[in-house]
């Protein structure tokens, strides 16, 4: 899995909006697992809520960011969190869960056979990934990243795409799973101060989608110039309204139960 520098505090700035898809995914899981592994657990804020649904389960969170694991261990000492690469992790578990993480793993669908093989019969693989890579927040970022001014600095700062729900369904059905796949577009209404270019949408992107670009621009002046240019583009694509800035965000959900 590609190494990216993460800032747990920045990520958690929109925790209420970011956590909603996780709860929508978990609420549809039909099984009662004894062991749960959360791949790409981040700061552990949503991993910890799994005890509400399954209070007797043994829960483990895995992430490749030392900063995220440190924050998770600090905030949720009752849950086991471990540093690891989710692309190579082989958990012994009844429920393999991943929330908004697999998009960072190139060719992640090619890993499905070994993950399903590791599950017991009746075990569940459930995940959610963003499906908004064709939205302005991402297409504008890609265009700017590939522009003459920035292409030389940001080569390789892209990230993997995701499949469509029907493609995930086919892949997992071929592995003898019963599959529930769907998509939802959330209309996040972002509110609060937004006196810098890009405002609240830029603040959201700073927690996730911008991380590879920020890693590729260690010079503070270059980074500030890039963010200012990107922020101006976001302001035009996501204008503020009297009730806040509306950020449409498509998500893809899959629950596969091994037969």
Locate predicted features.
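Helix-to-beta-strand junctions that scaffold the AdoMet/dcAdoMet cofactor pocket
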Residues: 105-106, 119-121
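A short SAM/SAH-binding and catalytic strip from SAM-dependent methyltransferases
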Residues: 95-109, 131
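Class I SAM-dependent methyltransferase SAM/SAH-binding core
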Residues: 35-89
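Short, conserved SAM-binding segment of the class I
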Residues: 110-115
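Conserved class I S-adenosyl-L-methionine
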Residues: 1-37, 45-49, 68-71, 142
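Conserved Class I S-adenosyl-L-methionine
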Residues: 43-45, 161-259
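Conserved catalytic/acceptor-binding region of the Class I
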Residues: 109, 124-195
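Short glycine-centered segments of the SAM/dcSAM-binding site in methyltransferase folds
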Residues: 35, 123-124
């Amino acid at each position: 899995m590609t190494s990216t520098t993460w800032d747990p505090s920045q990520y958690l700035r929109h925790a209420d909006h970011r956590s909603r898809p996780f709860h929508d995914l978990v609420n549809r899981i039909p099984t009662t697992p004894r062991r749960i592994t959360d791949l790409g657990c981040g700061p552990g804020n949503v991993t910890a809520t799994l005890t509400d649904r399954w209070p007797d389960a043994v829960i483990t969170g895995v992430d490749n960011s030392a900063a995220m694991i440190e924050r998770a261990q600090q905030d949720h000492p009752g849950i086991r969190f471990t540093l690891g690469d989710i692309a190579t992790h082989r958990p012994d578990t009844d429920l393999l869960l991943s929330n908004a993480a697999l998009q960072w793993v190139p060719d992640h669908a090619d890993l499905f056979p070994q993950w399903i093989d590791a599950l017991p019969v009746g075990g569940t693989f459930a995940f959610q990934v963003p499906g908004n890579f064709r939205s302005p927040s991402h297409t504008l970022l890609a265009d700017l990243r590939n522009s003459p001014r920035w292409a030389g600095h940001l080569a390789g700062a892209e990230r993997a795409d995701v499949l469509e729900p029907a493609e995930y369904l086919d892949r997992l059905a071929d592995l003898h799973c019963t599959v529930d796949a769907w998509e939802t577009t959330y209309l996040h209404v972002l509110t609060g101060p937004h006196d810098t270019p890009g405002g609240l949408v830029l603040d959201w992107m700073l927690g996730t989608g911008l991380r590879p670009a920020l890693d590729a621009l260690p010079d503070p002046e270059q980074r500030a110039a890039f963010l200012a240019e990107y922020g101006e583009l976001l302001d035009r694509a996501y204008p503020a309204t009297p009730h806040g800035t509306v950020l449409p965000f498509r998500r893809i959900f899959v629950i596969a139960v091994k037969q």
